[in-house]
């Protein structure tokens, strides 16, 4: 009986540890190891306005990697943008080129900075639902991420 109890404790701990990392996706290719953390998107009002998606990319590899693009079937035109603010405080979003994720570093795609624009939505982003998105990297790596949709006014993965 004692052996069964200890086995159940170990299994329970393992399950809890697995659940704590469920929001992180990992992909390895040689010396490259990318971890995706806390992907999320805001709910949209229909399909007439673009949607936004956010996440963090951690490079646990030994060499820099570049995020070069993405695909998302929910959007006819998905791209990475950067919010830039001029000296007068006026902000605008501009397409970003390839974005470096330094070896051992993290790239945050978040409101007011780099972010994913989902233009020409094929269906609305509905709170509580998810959608798949594929990230494209300079080394040819493609990584699919499942993105949960949060409330329309969300400012972070916590809502």
Task: Tell me the role of every PLM-derived stretch.
Residues 1-9:
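Positively charged n-region of N-terminal signal peptides that target proteins for export
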Residues 9-20:
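Bacterial N-terminal signal peptides
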Residues 21-25:
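Sec/Tat signal peptide C-region and signal peptidase I cleavage site
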Residues 26-159:
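Compact, glycine-rich, soluble single-domain proteins
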